[in-house]
Curated annotation (Swiss-Prot):
This is Transthyretin. GO terms for molecular function: hormone activity; identical protein binding; thyroid hormone binding. It is found in: Secreted. Residues 1-19 form the signal peptide. InterPro entries: Thyroxine_BS, Transthyretin/HIU_hydrolase, Transthyretin/HIU_hydrolase_d, Transthyretin/HIU_hydrolase_sf.
């Protein structure tokens, strides 16, 4: 069990790192990107490409769809939401995991998976949400940083 927990921690750190070849770091090309999502397929040990991701904001108890997109071949989505849209509040990122796993011929447990979090309650910040997926589990972490100044 300790080995599995160590593996998960290392995998999440690898997702959140900027070590991928040819990868442009969040601070370089995406200084205006307030929310970035990174997803890893832990079964195959590769980025989870073409995964549908939707971003919702809680408005008076209702979830309002703000934006949606699919992960790239690097398992990432940049600029899924603008600074103007990403105001203080509670957000939900919904991952269409059932569709993703079914396309790979697997029968997953979850219909979809949500990551719900409060954003910008201590001033404007940049958020990177990293997610590790299997057909029966999810693990997520967040890297929250100060916004980058334009050069």
């Amino acid at each position: 069990m300790a080995f599995f927990k160590s593996f998960l921690l290392l995998a999440l750190l690898a997702i959140a790192s900027e070590a991928a070849p040819g990868h442009v770091s969040h601070g370089e090309a995406d200084s205006k990107c307030p929310l970035m999502v990174k997803v890893l397929d832990a079964v195959r040990g590769i980025p989870a490409a073409n995964l549908l991701v939707q971003v919702f904001r809680n408005t008076e108890g209702n979830w309002e769809l703000i934006s949606s997109g699919k992960t790239t071949e690097l398992g990432e989505i940049h600029n899924i939401i603008t600074d103007e849209q990403f105001t203080e509040g509670v957000y939900k990122i919904e991952f269409a995991t059932k569709t993703f796993w079914r396309k790979l011929g697997l029968s997953p447990f979850h219909e979809y998976v949500d990551v719900v979090f409060s954003a910008n309650d201590a001033g404007h910040r940049h958020y990177t949400i990293a997610v590790l997926l299997t057909p029966y589990s999810i693990s997520s972490t967040a890297v929250v940083s100060e916004p980058h100044d334009d050069l």
